[in-house]
């Protein structure tokens, strides 16, 4: 069995795989272990730009931070970005290869597995330990053939597996026992133990169930992790479910929950800011009065633009601007605010051209080569420093002289501001993570005395909080044994 590799699989989506990998990675780093995260295949519309100029799932970028590393395409060699109900853009080693439906991708999996193994071998050679995250559940019978995301990968590289389940949803013992029962005998042997996630209450009441589980399966419970309130690491793909109650929120910000929304993690700093009341507005919901409307990124811009119109957002924005409100469009939202969006190659569906909302004098054409950059620059507001990343296939040209939103360090200009200073559009994702930019943009939107928020520092604190929890509640002797690292090693300086 492969030394120094441990795979975390879950009984369901959102069982806690990403969070557990993040926590263990940081705990290992604090013990002086050189560790890297790895997810063979990810399906997500939230992605991050890597140091080598590709894109990976955002969860792996957070895990890289937990390891003290810059994100790299080897950490997530296969990324699937859904762009229709039956198809997705297939990204291999950070670069888009093709749009495929489910049948075509199934036939492509052998090629995808080669990319997975190449990346895994590079990480294994470079690091003391590799923490692997599975996808969804390993017990999806219809997905087992040619599986590269869960047990198919674990069997190929011969690594141990921990199975995690979410007790907060109920049925945790059925999830664990049922998942185990649907695995092959060799896969069952590969599962070394269980972790129960999001437990609330008195552990004494759970202990009879834990004893039964261990006796019934012959496998140990390696830890019961408590439910953590106020943990705000980026969600893998689903929009955040938990609202944040704030007593001092005075700025109302809303955004449409587009069917193909991408990189909704852009809004996390707004959700966490104590003075901002942020809300996603779904279909059938009436948008409330707001100070700021933000149009998010989209993996299918023309279709989401049509959805906006069908759900009355064009009139909502028109009225909002008439009463002095502000509007921001990010990436696909920026393109929607222009005069037209052309897709001559059919990159996001049927080839054609759509009339934009018309509040910015720009026109966009979608081109096959995707732009992937991590960037820094200065906002037109107060010369505020801004950092972010670009992930887009659109080439946008200005149809009239307009104020540029950002001057980038490489000399390029990004985005435009309307002549009346009410509408801003730009390609930069992550624009609210920079404290200076966040303060300047909130002030522009109408908030006078802005409290400073350092989103990266909050994320770092959350990662350390997770590591503290697994240090306390996981069986580290067993974990160290799986990874062939010393259970008691501890780099004290790395904690400082």
UniProtKB/Swiss-Prot annotation:
PROSITE patterns in UniProt: GATASE_COBBQ
Biological process GO terms, please?
A: cobalamin biosynthetic process
> Which UniProt key words apply to this protein?
Cobalamin biosynthesis, Glutamine amidotransferase
Report the residue ranges that make up the GATase cobBQ-type domain in this protein: 250-437
Q: Per its UniProt record, what SUPFAM superfamilies does this chain match?
A: Class I glutamine amidotransferase-like, P-loop containing nucleoside triphosphate hydrolases
Which InterPro entries does the protein's record reference? Class_I_gatase-like, CobQ/CobB/MinD/ParA_Nub-bd_dom, CobQ_GATase1, CobQ_N, CobQ_synth, GATase_3, P-loop_NTPase
Active site per the UniProt annotation: 331, 429
Annotated GO MF terms: ABC-type vitamin B12 transporter activity; catalytic activity
The record's Pfam families line, in alphabetical order, gives: CbiA (PF01656), GATase_3 (PF07685)
Q: In which pathway does it act?
A: Cofactor biosynthesis; adenosylcobalamin biosynthesis
The regions listed as transmembrane in this protein's record are: none
Main function: Catalyzes amidations at positions B, D, E, and G on adenosylcobyrinic A,C-diamide. NH(2) groups are provided by glutamine, and one molecule of ATP is hydrogenolyzed for each amidation.
Could you say which protein family the record assigns here?
Answer: Belongs to the CobB/CobQ family. CobQ subfamily.
User: What is the protein name stated in its UniProt record?
Assistant: Cobyric acid synthase
């Amino acid at each position: 069995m492969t030394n120094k590799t441990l795979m975390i699989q879950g009984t369901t989506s959102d069982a806690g795989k990403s969070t557990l990998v993040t926590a263990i990675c940081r705990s290992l780093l604090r013990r002086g272990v050189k560790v890297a995260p790895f997810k063979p295949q990810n399906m997500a519309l939230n992605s991050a730009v890597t140091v080598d100029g590709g894109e990976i799932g955002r969860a792996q970028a957070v895990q890289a931070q937990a390891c003290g590393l810059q994100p790299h395409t080897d950490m997530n060699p296969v990324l699937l970005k859904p762009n229709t109900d039956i198809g997705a853009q297939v990204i291999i080693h950070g670069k888009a290869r093709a749009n495929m439906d489910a049948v075509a991708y199934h036939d492509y999996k052998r090629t995808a597995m080669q990319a997975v193994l190449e990346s895994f071998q590079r990480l294994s050679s470079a690091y003391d330990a590799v923490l692997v995250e599975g996808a969804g559940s390993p017990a999806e019978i219809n997905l087992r053939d040619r599986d590269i995301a869960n047990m198919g990968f674990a069997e190929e590289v011969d690594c141990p597996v921990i199975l995690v389940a979410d007790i907060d949803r109920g049925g945790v013992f059925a999830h664990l026992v049922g998942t185990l029962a649907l695995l092959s005998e060799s896969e069952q042997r590969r599962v070394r133990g269980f972790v129960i996630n999001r437990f609330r209450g008195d552990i004494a009441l759970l202990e009879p169930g834990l004893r039964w589980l261990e006796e019934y399966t012959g496998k140990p419970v390696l830890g019961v992790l408590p439910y953590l309130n106020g943990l705000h690491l980026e969600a893998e793909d689903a929009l955040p479910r938990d609202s944040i109650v704030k007593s001092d929120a005075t700025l109302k910000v809303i955004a449409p929950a587009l069917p193909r929304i991408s990189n909704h993690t852009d809004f996390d700093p707004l959700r966490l800011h104590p003075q901002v009341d942020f809300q996603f507005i779904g279909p059938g919901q009436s948008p409330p009065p707001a100070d700021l409307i933000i149009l998010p990124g989209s993996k299918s811009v023309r279709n989401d633009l049509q959805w906006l119109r069908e759900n009355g957002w064009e009139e909502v924005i028109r009225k909002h601007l008439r009463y002095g409100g502000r509007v921001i469009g990010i990436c696909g939202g920026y393109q929607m605010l222009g005069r037209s969006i052309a897709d001559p190659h059919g990159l996001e569906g049927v080839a054609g051209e759509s009339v934009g909302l018309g509040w910015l004098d720009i026109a966009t054409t979608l081109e096959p080569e995707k732009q992937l950059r991590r960037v820094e620059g200065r906002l037109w507001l107060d010369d505020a420093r801004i950092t972010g990343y670009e992930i887009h296939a659109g080439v946008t040209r200005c149809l009239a002289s307009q104020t540029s939103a950002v001057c980038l360090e490489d000399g390029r200009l990004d985005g435009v501001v309307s002549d009346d200073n009410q509408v801003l559009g730009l390609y930069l994702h992550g624009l609210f993570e920079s404290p200076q930019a966040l303060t300047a943009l909130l002030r522009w939107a109408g908030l006078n005395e802005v409290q400073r928020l350092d989103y990266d520092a909050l994320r770092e604190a959350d990662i350390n909080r997770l590591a503290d929890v697994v240090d306390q509640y996981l069986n580290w002797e067993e974990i160290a044994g799986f990874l062939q690292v010393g259970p008691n090693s501890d780099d004290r300086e790395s904690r400082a």
